[in-house]
Each structure stands twice: as structure tokens, then as C-alpha cells.
Amino acid sequence: MRIWKVERNTLETQILVELNIDGSGKAEIDTGIGFLDHMLTLMSFHGKFDLKVICKGDTYVDDHHSVEDIGIAIGEAFKNALGDKKGIRRYSNIYIPMDESLSMVAIDISNRPYLVFNAKFDTQMIGSMSTQCFKEFFRAFVNESRVTLHINLLYGENDHHKIESIFKAFARALKEGSEIVSNEIASSKGVL
């Protein structure tokens, strides 16, 4: 099974992440940031990953350190759980609507970290989470997991719906891209 555990402890955060890529969508999430808990729970469910994220962070400052470090820890868990990536599909692109919002997320599990994040939000906060931190989460995930990730919010009005469509599309793209579909490395170079 493709499982990995990460413990990340800094002066700003203490984080535990456990990820089972081949899980059933079970989530145990407690980040101290309610809206992020909601998004990570959706990510686990729609990606069919078993995901545990426990974070104690300096949210009295703001949410940035916790959000970024959670992205780092989940990215590290994803990269290591995949191992040598033998047999994975590698590529995926998914469109997901959430009411009036539509997002497209494309991924290449390539060992080449790159983020394109085309999404704008009208509000500064959703609950206790800064909308600026969503890009920071995905940047941290990309840099640590070493994937190429394109996030395109095509349209939408409600920021909650916009972000939810992004996270659901991200989850489905991760799931599809990491599916085992052969016994070969999906690269003409022979390595990912």
C-alpha cells in the first residue's frame, strides 16, 4: 500500500500528516482553521485518500504558517507514498462545478514542481481563513511533492463555491494521476 507519515515540527507549527493514497476517503482533520478542515475533508473524500492532518499552529498570529506548513507536509507525504511512481497514470485534468463556479485542475506527476494558479477571490476571508493562503497551500504542496499543477477557476461568484470546486477538482486530479494503470514508468526517459 502507498502510505506515508510526516511529522513536521517548527517554532510556528507542529503537524502530523498520515496519507494512504489507496484508501477509501476517510478523513481525520483538525488544523485549527475551520474552513481548511472542510476543504481537506472534501479532498480526502473526493480523492478517496485516507488523510489525517493534525496541526497546532500559531494562528494567534494568522493562518499563513499553518496553511503553508500543512501544504508542505501533505506534499511530502504524497511524494513519498508514491515511491518510484512505477505504473501511475501520471497525467490528469478534471473539471468540477460547484453550483455557479467551475474549475479545471490539471496535474503532471513529473518530479518538476511548477504551479499555475489562475483564481481570484472577492473576499479576504472565509471564516478564519485568508483567501490569499489558498495559493500558498498549493505552492507549498507543489514544491514538496514535485508535481506540475495548473489550477484554473473558469468562473464563479461565491468564494466558498469557487474554492470548493478547486479542491474537489484537485482531489480528483490527484487520484486519477496517481492511479496504477500499467507496470511501466510513464516517461520516455524511464524515470519520473
From Swiss-Prot:
Lineage top rank: taxon: Bacteria
Broad class of where this protein is predominantly found: cytoplasm
Record's keyword terms, sorted: Amino-acid biosynthesis, Cytoplasm, Histidine biosynthesis, Lyase
Functional pathway: Amino-acid biosynthesis; L-histidine biosynthesis; L-histidine from 5-phospho-alpha-D-ribose 1-diphosphate: step 6/9
E.C. no: 4.2.1.19
Catalytic reaction annotation: D-erythro-1-(imidazol-4-yl)glycerol 3-phosphate = 3-(imidazol-4-yl)-2-oxopropyl phosphate + H2O
GO MF term list: imidazoleglycerol-phosphate dehydratase activity
One GO cellular component term noted in the UniProt record for this chain: cytoplasm
Places the protein is found: Cytoplasm
NCBIfam families per record: PRK00951.2-1, PRK00951.2-4
HAMAP family: HisB
Family membership: Belongs to the imidazoleglycerol-phosphate dehydratase family.
Identification of the protein by name: Imidazoleglycerol-phosphate dehydratase
Organism of origin: Clostridioides difficile (strain 630) (Peptoclostridium difficile)
